[in-house]
């Protein structure tokens, strides 16, 4: 479960036994000698409004789709703005703009780089959208308005630049703003021997019970079989055999909240020559 009382001090992209575990703990810790994490969380939450919104005179910019309520003044008129939704599990938000009286104003909605088929309904009617420097700007008379935002963000395989030596010929799985990982809790040990074919469609399900509820991704892959290897012998003149595996991926930000085990973000890509 997600208690929130323990944390990671390093954002590593893999956790393997007897290597990184020797100097980086494989489980979340309650406290560190350098206590930067708790106050950083506090500062971020306290300043979150500055990240969600940007205001300039009679213009308000919505940068992040985080459920919240705020009060602003546009053209001298007080407005209450409310964002409701279940992002990033659902790619839709409802934005209510409630003014004391009607006035001229502009509201701008950021279009995330990963968003496809971005749509906005204003009071139930679809708006003609023109993107300007990453934002959809809607100007005119504002009073009591409801904006319904929706877009697609399918999970995809993302390769590493070949100049990144340790991740060359490897891929990560990303959905919208979330990076995913495989954990030993779902997929067994020796995750470094897993390979995936990036031509497949990534399946997505929502698990109400897992980690307080989150979107889980499912893919198929190959894993180097350990059958026939002589115990204690590191190298053998033999053919490598592969076996089929089904892999479950969870959001990277949630890793380490279950059993102590391996974790991997970058997986080897399976090439067919």
Model-based region annotation:
Residues 151-229, 254:
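Glycine/proline-rich low-complexity spacer/linker segments in large multi-domain proteins
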Residues 102, 111-116:
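Short proline/glycine-enriched turn/loop motifs at strand-loop junctions of beta-rich domains
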Residues 1-9:
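Single conserved hydrophobic/aromatic residue that forms the stacking wall/gate
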Residues 105-108, 138-156, 183:
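C-terminal beta-strand-rich structural cap/linker in extracellular carbohydrate-active enzymes
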Residues 53-99, 108-110, 249, 256-273:
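Edge strands and adjacent loops of beta-rich recognition modules
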Residues 10-90:
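Catalytic cores of secreted or luminal carbohydrate-active enzymes
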Residues 204-273:
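Activation corresponds to long, low-complexity, non-globular regions
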Residues 115-140, 157-163:
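Solvent-exposed beta-strand/loop surfaces of large extracellular or lumenal domains
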């Amino acid at each position: 479960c997600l208690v929130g009382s323990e944390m990671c001090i390093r954002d590593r992209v893999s956790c393997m036994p007897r290597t990184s575990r020797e100097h980086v703990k494989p489980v979340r810790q309650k406290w560190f000698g350098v206590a930067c994490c708790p106050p950083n969380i506090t500062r971020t939450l306290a300043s979150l409004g500055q990240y969600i919104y940007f205001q300039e005179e009679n213009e308000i910019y919505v940068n992040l789709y985080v459920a919240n309520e705020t009060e602003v003044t546009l053209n001298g008129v007080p407005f209450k703005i409310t964002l409701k939704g279940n992002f990033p599990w659902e790619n839709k938000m409802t934005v209510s703009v409630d003014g004391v009286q009607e006035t001229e104003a502009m509201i701008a909605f950021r279009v995330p780089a990963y968003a496809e088929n971005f749509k906005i309904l204003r009071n139930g009617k679809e708006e003609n959208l023109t993107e300007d420097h990453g934002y959809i700007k809607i100007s005119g008379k504002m009073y009591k308005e409801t904006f319904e935002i929706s877009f697609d963000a399918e999970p995809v395989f993302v390769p590493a630049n070949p100049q990144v030596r340790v991740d060359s010929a490897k891929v990560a799985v990303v959905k919208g703003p979330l990076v995913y990982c495989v954990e030993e809790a779902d997929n067994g040990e020796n995750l470094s021997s897993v390979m995936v074919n990036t031509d497949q469609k990534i399946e997505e399900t929502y698990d109400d019970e897992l980690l307080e509820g989150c979107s889980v991704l499912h893919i198929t892959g190959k894993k180097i079989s350990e059958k026939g290897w002589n115990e204690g012998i590191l190298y053998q003149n033999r053919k490598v055999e592969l076996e089929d595996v089904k892999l479950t991926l969870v959001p990277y930000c949630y890793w380490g909240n279950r059993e102590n085990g391996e974790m991997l973000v970058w997986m080897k890509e399976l090439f067919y020559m």
